[in-house]
Amino acid sequence: MDKKSYLSHSEAVILQAIASSYKYGFDIMDISGLPSGTVYPALRRLEETGLVESRWEKEGVAQRAQRPARKYYELTRVGKEALAEALKRYRLLDRLVPRVPRSVKPSTERG
């Protein structure tokens, strides 16, 4: 079996939450309704298996906002394929976590 066959419902919800654009952890929790104890371990697993990739925003952006730098997550090509399969398996996923419009891509390089 391939990577996408092992998606849990929570992982599928997380993939759906970040499908439209880069998201950081709190955004993912807000969109998905899942707690941090579910989201962050799942994001680590999804990144380890190549379904998502992460990037840190530029330090200057965070400094101007007077907060720590955010780590943003985005689906990989394999992650998009896994989400497509998950949408077939979990038919209500689109209703539970509607796709949000693509937002402006954050500045993710450190500088």
What would you call each of these model-derived segments?
Residues S20-Y24, E48-T49, V78-K80:
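Short, charged/polar surface micro-motifs in flexible loops or helix N-caps
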Residues Y6, A65-A69:
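A generic structural micro-feature
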Residues T49-Q66, E74:
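Beta-hairpin "wing" of winged helix-turn-helix
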Residues D2-Y40, R44:
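N-terminal helix-turn-helix DNA-binding core of bacterial DNA-binding proteins
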Residues V78-G111:
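Amphipathic alpha-helical dimerization/coiled-coil segments
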Residues S8, L75-T76:
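Residue-level signal for threonine
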